[in-house]
């Protein structure tokens, strides 16, 4: 998530909002105050899948707040 001086994040319609909110691509998860505890056992991952984690795209998809608290560039989807 990008911030503009720690106080601005790109909000809806590519306009800057309050807080460090990034692009707010997941608004339903934005302000949740719940905890989830997952218990269980999973099989060990083999090396074929371990390297694939490096290919994820950044969450804000190049959406950053500039020095004047405007999104620059903003490609929110």
From Swiss-Prot:
The organism's place on the tree of life at top rank: Eukaryota
Record flagged with keyword Nucleotide-binding: no
GO molecular function: copper ion binding
UniProt entry keywords in alphabetical sequence: Metal-binding, Metal-thiolate cluster
UniProt key word tRNA processing: no
Tissue specificity: Expressed in vascular tissues of all organs. Expressed in root and leaf phloem, pollen and root hairs.
Function: Metallothioneins have a high content of cysteine residues that bind various heavy metals. Functions as a metal chelator of copper (Cu) and zinc (Zn). Functions cooperatively with the phytochelatin synthase PCS1 to protect plants from Cu and cadmium toxicity. Plays a role in Cu homeostasis, specifically in the remobilization of Cu from senescing leaves. The mobilization of Cu from internal sources is important for seed development.
Similarity annotation: Belongs to the metallothionein superfamily. Type 15 family.
Name of this protein: Metallothionein-like protein 2B
